[in-house]
């Protein structure tokens, strides 16, 4: 009887330790555990028939996302950081939006990077709103840390439009990824001036530089 009670206590203790580590039944809870090494997953949002947000003058989010993501990849690989892209062309990753998002999350979870960064563009009904915004999963300490670092770097581009990193618990990628992940909204396509910036190669270089610098600071 004593032996059974002792075994039960040991089992309960181990279960408690697993919960504290953010692991249950062999799976990390969303955004709770950092991956190993210096592998980064870059996720260029949307693609294919899913153009994402449309700019005031017709700019398509999917194209801007991919161009900026490829620039970030180039900067990171030049510094010896391994990068996996969820997409490197204009193709969608699934027949439906849900299937597409599931595949992106599957890649993140399978590769288990130290950080996954999903690149997007924003839009809002108020045409005057502009500036980059970084989101993280609300319950992820690692995600919060990464988001704050990236937000700080992006705020340097134009301090007038500085923002704070925001927690979110509803975005599919944020709540289903088992690794630290952030969503970077580089700017607002609903703002005419920012749309013009976001389609320019020079400004894309600037944004890519800020994001890659933030990633490197997070890794360090």
Residues of each region from the PLM?
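Active-site-adjacent substrate-binding region
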Residues: 143-165
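Sec-exported extracytoplasmic/periplasmic mature domains
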Residues: 70-81, 109-113, 151-159, 203, ...
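Hydrophobic/aromatic residues positioned on beta-strands within the core alpha/beta folds
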Residues: 43-44, 186
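Conserved beta-strand segments of alpha/beta enzyme cores
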Residues: 82, 161-164, 180
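Active-site-adjacent mobile loop/cap segments within catalytic or ligand-binding domains
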Residues: 111, 125, 167-220
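Peptidoglycan cell-wall recognition and remodeling modules
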Residues: 50-54, 92-93, 158, 162-164, ...
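Hydrophobic membrane-insertion alpha-helices, especially the h-region
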Residues: 1-15
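Catalytic-core regions of hydrolytic enzymes
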Residues: 22-40, 46-148
């Amino acid at each position: 009887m004593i032996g059974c009670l002792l075994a039960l206590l040991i089992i309960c203790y181990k279960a408690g330790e697993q919960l504290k580590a953010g692991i249950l039944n062999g799976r990390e809870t969303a955004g709770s555990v950092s991956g190993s090494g210096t592998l980064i997953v870059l996720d260029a949002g949307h693609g294919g028939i899913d153009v994402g947000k449309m700019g005031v003058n017709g700019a398509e989010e999917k194209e801007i996302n991919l161009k900026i993501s490829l620039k970030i990849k180039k900067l990171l690989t030049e510094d010896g950081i391994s990068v996996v892209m969820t997409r490197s062309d204009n193709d969608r990753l699934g027949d439906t939006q849900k299937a597409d998002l599931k595949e992106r999350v599957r890649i993140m979870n399978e590769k288990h990077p130290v950080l996954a960064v999903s690149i997007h563009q924003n839009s809002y009904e108020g045409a005057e709103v502009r500036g980059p915004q970084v989101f993280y999963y609300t319950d992820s300490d690692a995600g919060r840390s990464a988001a704050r670092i990236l937000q700080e770097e992006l705020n340097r581009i134009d301090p007038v439009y500085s923002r704070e990193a925001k927690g979110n618990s509803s975005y599919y990628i944020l709540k289903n990824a088992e690794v630290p992940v952030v969503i970077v909204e580089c700017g607002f396509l609903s703002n005419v001036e920012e749309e013009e910036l976001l389609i320019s190669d020079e400004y894309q270089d600037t944004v890519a530089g800020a994001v890659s610098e933030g990633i490197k600071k997070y890794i360090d």
